[in-house]
UniProtKB/Swiss-Prot annotation:
Protein name in the entry: Large ribosomal subunit protein bL20
Entry's family note: Belongs to the bacterial ribosomal protein bL20 family.
Source species, domain of life: Bacteria
Entry keywords, A to Z: Ribonucleoprotein, Ribosomal protein, RNA-binding, rRNA-binding
Amino acid sequence: MPRVKGGTVTRKRRKKVLKLAKGYRGAKHLLFKAANAQVMVSYRYAFRDRRAKKRDFRRLWIARINAAARMNDISYSKLMHGLKVANVDMNRKMLADLAVSDPDGFKAVADTAKKALA
């Protein structure tokens, strides 16, 4: 039997990796071995950062809510507790968006929390 080197399969696989490595600097977008190593690292970064993104956005929302709450003379923790007591079911993403896009609406929400705590 003749020896099979898998030319078309190998070329297709290498071409796919080099396509994924487009935009990388130096040999990492030209040479298969370097490109393959960098693509593997990039996959690890992407996996890690998909999880970190959730934490980062939550931190951003909390910072925005806290800033808007303090402009309405209430701390973040008291605002959240007041909303829980008042049975206002708004998540942090919605509150942060409200704080940025509609300060008057956020003021009404903050007043609701204050009344629930009083």
